[in-house]
């Protein structure tokens, strides 16, 4: 059975759950298509959330924001519990790893749900159709029809594939329609390039991908840049410290041209183009195929299997050279981290703040969702990390009225959000100033569309009322 969220679909093993799936979907999951971590579609909008363009794509009027039955926090909790019913599953979507999954993780993180790796733990796996359809199209041009973009390259936008393939199930960018269109694309891959489809299922989890990398040693992996897919026949040489990604040697380059270089010149070579090493982020569901596939394409077809394996052997016989590369990349990563002195917002610390949660914080997070407002207030100071205390304050401010909260906490958080919203600088979040500019830009874009203009006027009025609550904070 197949079920949907946003522009993706998830594989479910229980047909009896279909009715529940559809009923839940009808509540609206378009919030996962939003491109801002502070804005949520089809949710009960808090007074510090500002609607922007992604809502306009789905023609969502401001009335929906005011009348939705669930707050954002309530929907996150409900969604988390709902996903648990389908564990283990493949969480599949279109470009889902670039946005949707990261978005969902951050929603769990900010909602104090400690299981923010829900979609790739306890047997769950992440599966992204976009890189697979790109690779499939490279291998077999007839897999799926595409249109050319302005640069003359195949367009892999889901809306374009749906239009050209004549399988559009409705208005693109709505959650269920995009899901159904994604399923159609997945079918095309499975039917037209079954080897790609099977390979994609085998790399849907980091540990599965590592097993393939470690067993194959030499393999073909696809990368997509400058609007085109490219196969690389490569030799895995080590896992990056500290990022844990697979670092491979591109076997179009002969190792003997680099083995004798001193550290300084080797470092320059590693940072020059064309790249002699490839970084395979194997937690991103990459397409990893047999080496023989890449040998069908330039320039590897001219090098040949014997020379490819000879180059691989040379790398095996020179561990000191490999260690030098590893050391250089580790130093470069450290320098990059040290050069970035900008203090991240608490909302940005899902990785920077460390991946492990202390047992005490995890226990308090679980309690937070089960106790009343008094109990929640009592937990604020019990968290060992400031970011968790901050998230608790945010949730209390969003979920409870002013009269239910201590005056000091309400004022603290009200001023905090007022400072953010009234900023006139270019910020990472939506401000009143950035909203009004975007609203004016959309008015110009849709000047001949009365329906869009009416919705935009509604957004403008909605935000003007919101602004009044914060100007004197």
Question: What is each stretch, according to the model?
Answer:
Residues 55-141, 295-364:
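Conserved DEDDh/DEDDy metal-dependent 3′-5′ exonuclease domain
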Residues 409-473:
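C-terminal non-catalytic accessory extensions
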Residues 21, 34-60, 83-194, 203, ...:
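Metal-dependent phosphoesterase core characteristic of DEDDh/y 3'-5' exonuclease domains
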């Amino acid at each position: 059975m197949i079920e949907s969220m946003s522009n993706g679909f998830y594989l479910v093993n229980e047909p009896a759950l279909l009715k529940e799936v559809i009923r839940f979907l009808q509540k609206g999951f378009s919030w996962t298509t939003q491109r801002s971590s502070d804005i949520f579609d089809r949710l009960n909008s808090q007074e510090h959330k500002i609607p922007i363009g992604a809502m306009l794509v789905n023609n969502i009027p401001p009335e929906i924001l005011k009348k939705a039955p669930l707050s954002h926090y309530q929907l996150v909790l409900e969604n988390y519990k709902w996903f648990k019913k389908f564990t283990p599953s493949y969480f599949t979507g279109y470009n889902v790893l670039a946005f949707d999954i990261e978005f969902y993780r951050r929603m769990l993180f900010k909602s104090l749900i400690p299981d923010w790796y829900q979609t790739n733990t306890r047997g769950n796996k992440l599966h992204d159709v976009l890189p697979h359809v790109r690779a499939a199209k490279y291998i077999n041009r007839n897999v799926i029809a595409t249109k050319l973009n302005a640069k003359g390259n195949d367009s892999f936008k889901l809306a374009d594939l749906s239009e050209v393939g004549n399988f559009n199930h409705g208005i693109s960018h709505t959650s269920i329609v995009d899901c159904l269109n994604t399923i159609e694309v997945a079918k095309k891959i499975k039917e037209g390039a079954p080897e790609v489809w099977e390979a994609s299922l085998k790399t849907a989890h980091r540990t599965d991908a590592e097993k393939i990398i470690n067993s194959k040693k030499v393999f073909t992996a696809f990368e997509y840049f400058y609007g085109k897919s490219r196969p690389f026949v490569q030799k895995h040489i080590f896992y990056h410290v500290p990022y844990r990604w697979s670092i491979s040697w591109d076997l179009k380059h002969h190792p003997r041209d680099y083995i004798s270089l001193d550290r300084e010149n080797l470092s320059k070579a590693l940072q020059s183009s064309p790249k002699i090493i490839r970084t395979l982020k194997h937690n991103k569901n990459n397409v990893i195929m047999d080496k023989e596939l890449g040998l069908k394409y330039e320039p590897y077809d001219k090098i040949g299997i014997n020379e490819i394996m000879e180059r691989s052997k040379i790398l095996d016989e020179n561990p000191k050279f490999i260690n030098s590369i590893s050391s250089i990349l580790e130093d470069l990563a450290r320098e990059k981290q040290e050069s970035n002195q900008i203090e991240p917002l608490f909302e940005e610390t899902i990785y920077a703040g460390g991946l492990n949660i202390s047992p005490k914080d995890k226990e308090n997070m679980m309690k937070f969702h089960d106790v009343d407002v008094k109990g929640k207030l009592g937990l604020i100071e019990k968290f060992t990390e400031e970011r968790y205390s901050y998230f608790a304050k945010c949730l209390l401010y969003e979920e409870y009225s002013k009269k239910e909260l201590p005056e000091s906490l309400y004022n603290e958080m009200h001023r905090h959000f007022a400072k953010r919203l009234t900023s006139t600088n270019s910020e990472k979040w939506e401000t009143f100033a950035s909203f009004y500019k975007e609203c004016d830009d959309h008015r110009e874009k849709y000047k001949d569309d009365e329906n869009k203009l009416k919705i935009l006027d509604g957004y403008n009025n909605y935000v003007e009322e919101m602004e009044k609550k914060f100007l004197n904070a």
